[in-house]
Amino acid sequence: MDVPRTLLVTNDFPPRVGGIQRTLEALVKELPADRVGVFCPDWDEAEAYDAVAPFRMLRQPERFLWPTPAVRDRIEAAARAMDAEVVLFGATYPLALLGPRLAARGLPYLSAAHGFEYWLSIAPGTHALLRHATSRAARVPVLCSAFIARTVRTAVKGSVPVSVLYPGADVQRFRPDLQTQDIRERLRIGDRPLVVCVSRLVARKGQDTLIRAMPAIRSRVPGACLLIVGGGPDEERLRSMAGELPADVIAFSGQVKEEDLPRYYAAGDVFAMPCRTRLGGLEVEGWGNVFIEAAACAKPVVVGDSGGARESLVDGETGILVDGRRTQAVAEAVGDLLADPARARAMGLAGRQRVLDAHTWPDIAARLATWLHDAAPR
């Protein structure tokens, strides 16, 4: 794949954990390593990561980068050092606020958008930030959903092309034939029907609704249990809720290593994350790449209808779309799939095929490469 020399500027990159971090890493791994540099903050275990990274790592001493003149000067120096032809900001806020100045000095840029840019698009007083950051961008690739893209497009008022670039999954890592017996044994799940939820533990993701739904699910599917994978600020509250149920109903794995994550998806019979919109519409699920990773493992998905999450499945074919605010709806959807393994299996296989057809990283990176070429000087 031929691409112009590209400097990725981002606060979000491994070994820091998160969905944006994994998306950006997956994209740059598909680009020619000698054509890419990554300008990003320091993080725990960064030295070990950088030592084996195939692309150039330009690690900065701070833990978070703000759009200051000093950071702008360092970006320009890094771009000159690698003779970069284009800058890709991994997110619009905050670092793409430096983009117009870079463009004025002859360095074109793309400004990626995610769920947070939705908030910038609709929250009072923040439109100006978004419009300024993208005012001289060659393009805004929205690395989540058409829902977010529509909102961003309205906010920037047509001043820049806004295009959806749906994230994907590594189908060699996330696949259905992984060995998971040790996970089930260690968590004392055995061969019981298992619902898995992989996500950061925050209120929007809906783990609390899953916990509330488990008694109704178990009344239909005796022995069913729930595995919650991930960490976050809601963990104490969720563990307290789980403590009100029998000890064998809910298991928490905590944060798991990136290399182990596919096996946790594969360990389940159904994947569920009944995400919900909060704060009067200010907080939505921009996409939910966990649904794509679960589908790649041939798991049927139960998806909360918030923001762009509905775009991650074909309702009734690869999973079931639910109102994540309604415990009964979540219990019915999960219970239906656990009670009908043949239907669940068919949905899971359809989901994996959809990932193979439309959500593989090489194809996604090829679209990005086209936009980078369009932005680079002729």
Model-derived features with residue positions:
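Short hydrophobic beta-strand element within catalytic cores of glycosyltransferases
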Residues: 291-296, 300-303, 313
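Nucleotide-activated donor-binding/catalytic signature segment of Leloir-type glycosyltransferases, i.e.
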Residues: 236-262, 270
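Conserved donor-binding/catalytic core segment of Leloir-type glycosyltransferases
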Residues: 9, 189-205, 211-215
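Conserved acidic donor-binding segment of nucleotide-sugar-dependent glycosyltransferases
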Residues: 314-316, 320-327, 336-342
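Acidic donor-binding loop of glycosyltransferase active sites
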Residues: 266-284, 299
